[in-house]
């Protein structure tokens, strides 16, 4: 399905809440812009390593349908280890951050990811998920009226916000794990990637099950639940006085 100019213009509106969040954190919470840059930088380095490992390991297993669950789990682990690993590296070299600076770190990741998604026809191009993603987009393109509005615009818009919340929660958990020497928050963050990028994301897209609207609804519900859990975990683990 080819995107119209209206589709492309609407896709860029997903950046508006991120612009508001960045402005709020910078001007109301005195968060320096470099915190957003650090976050997006950690995501970029993590994605580079993730793509190398994906093409070197995960993609070699994609042709065996009987291994899809294991392949999906491996993809989730690779995604979590690379992205969270680079966040951990950044946190190890950065000075102690405030709560809002850690939040900004995650917002920076959500912003750059949303920008890539809004400006790329198919972010999964060149992967084993490219065909399934194209089929999903074509299916949504055949919808009209209310369903087209919901599945073509509202839910994809919501997905970027949900993903940003997951990034904020997981990076917050990684930060807490590093400064408290408690591995449980890190395990929780890794489990979120295992489920979101692996069991839910990779497996369902690879099997083409997201073309079923009921499965698509369950996917968004599952991702929303993960976002709530990791954000709640970050808030609960964060000490009242911070780490300053």
Where are the predicted features?
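Hydrophobic alpha-helical segments at protein termini of multi-pass membrane proteins
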Residues: 1-244
